[in-house]
């Protein structure tokens, strides 16, 4: 569970290649990047491998900001694993849950 704060805008380039569209307002950007963070955090926990790289190996290839369902991947030498992600939004907080496809 993660609280939506403007700090995420400074951190985003460290954990995702995704960039908000130029016409997206700041509040929506904060929510979108927080959602990405919670998705990657959930993927990292399910991967349970210290060698997994947060930026490179935890991917949301077709991320749609604030969509409640997303597809995600964990890439690794043994083969990629696909996951379905559900995100939940409540009063300035976001959390995401990952399940295998």
Annotate each PLM feature.
Residues 2-101:
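Core catalytic alpha/beta fold that binds nucleotide/phospho-ligands
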